[in-house]
Regions:
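Short cysteine-rich clusters marking metal-coordination/redox-active sites
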Residues: 25-28, 60-63
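Charge-dense, low-complexity intrinsically disordered regions
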Residues: 145-318
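Histidine-centered nuclease catalytic patch
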Residues: 32-54
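Internal, well-ordered alpha/beta segment that forms a basic, Gly-enriched binding/recognition surface
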Residues: 64-159
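Residues immediately within or flanking Cys/His clusters that coordinate Zn2+
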Residues: 22-25, 38, 57
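Chitinase-like catalytic core of GlcNAc-active glycosidases
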Residues: 57-59, 68-69
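Short, flexible, mixed-charge glycine/proline-rich loop motifs
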Residues: 10-22, 49-54
Length: 318
């Protein structure tokens, strides 16, 4: 149904790499040398999600400044995952929730060991259930986190996809490119759907990547382009809709690809990373709202000291 037409994979701590055409902005078209900064000015993937090595040569300073608002919204949307996973952004591992709010997640390192600090002031919202002969502890941790603008977060994903989309396809995505220039604009009159999945909460895999998929058969009732972006323990997928290519495709589509990738082992070979079945979000709105997860449930075995987090999605009426 789909074929890969572009992809980039970044390992945390690798060598610097650059994509795009130097001194020609693929987003606004400027080619004035004075409009561009250093080679490392524009991150192809958000720095807040852990990217320190992949940079875009074809992104001018003006566009980079605009896009930073979108990327900030995306990081706020998945803030708990970044904190729990220990993902280091521009200023280290982000704190989820503001000091003084009802719940705060903090990541700390002490003598090379990671620690998660949880502050919760509404203690009645935290409960635990002991099961399996007092071996299994289940702890529900409510999370307020930060508010984000859903449309901005969506446009951060759109920008990532357009950074990798082959230039020959741009003629079909002019509206997508143009909407990035106006902060509140949408790429079209349709729901801005996002498929979200997760893996390894609490220990983010040190990898980021984006894959651009193109429909094989033009008559299939599926989007012409789907972009899948993975960042540590989180994975997103969006459809890049084209008025020309997607006339026969419904506005509301389910983004339900179950994604698996591989992480290289130091000794050779690869370790598979399997993401969950995608949760469907509509990120069309311009009103700020709390990040999409109201709580994380920690299941912890007191004897083996092993545990796992399960995210609990926030109700749509919250």
């Amino acid at each position: 149904m789909y074929k890969v037409i572009a992809q980039e994979l970044v390992g945390i701590g690798g060598d610097q790499r650059f994509i795009g055409e130097a001194r020609k902005c693929r987003f606004c078209g400027t080619s004035d040398p004075s409009d561009f900064g250093k080679k490392t000015n524009a991150h192809a993937f958000p720095e807040g999600l852990g990217n320190k090595t992949l940079f875009s040569l074809g992104e001018c300073c003006s566009c980079n400044s605009k896009f930073s608002r979108y990327e900030d919204a995306l990081c706020k949307a998945v803030g708990p995952y970044l904190t729990l996973g220990g993902v280091k952004g521009k200023n280290g591992v982000r704190q989820t929730g503001r000091s003084g709010s009802s719940s705060v997640l903090k990541h700390e390192e002490n003598q090379g060991k990671r620690h998660i600090q949880i502050e919760a002031r509404n203690i009645e919202d935290i409960h635990s259930v002991i099961k399996n002969n007092n071996e299994l502890l289940r702890l529900r941790i409510p999370i307020d986190g930060d508010k984000f603008v859903p449309r901005y977060a969506y446009k951060a994903l759109l920008k990532i996809a357009l950074s990798l989309l082959p230039v020959k396809e741009f003629c079909s995505y002019r509206q997508n490119l143009e909407c990035l220039q106006e902060i509140d604009d949408a790429p079209g009159d349709y729901p801005l759907q996002v498929g979200f999945s997760y893996a390894w909460i609490g220990n983010a895999p040190p990898t980021l990547g984006c894959v651009i998929l193109q429909r094989n058969n033009d008559t299939d009732p599926v989007p012409y382009i789907i972009a899948i972006f993975q960042a540590g323990s989180v994975c997103f997928q969006i459809a890049l809709r084209s008025e020309e290519k997607d006339r026969h495709v419904q506005n509301a589509v389910s983004l339900s690809i179950v994604w698996t990738t591989q992480l290289a082992k130091p000794e050779g070979d690869f370790f598979p990373i399997e993401y969950s079945s995608p949760i469907q979000f509509d990120w069309s709105g311009l009103n700020p709202q709390l990040q999409p997860f109201e709580a994380f449930e920690l299941t912890f075995n007191a004897h083996t000291t092993q545990g796992a987090y399960l995210p609990l999605a926030r109700r749509t009426d919250q």
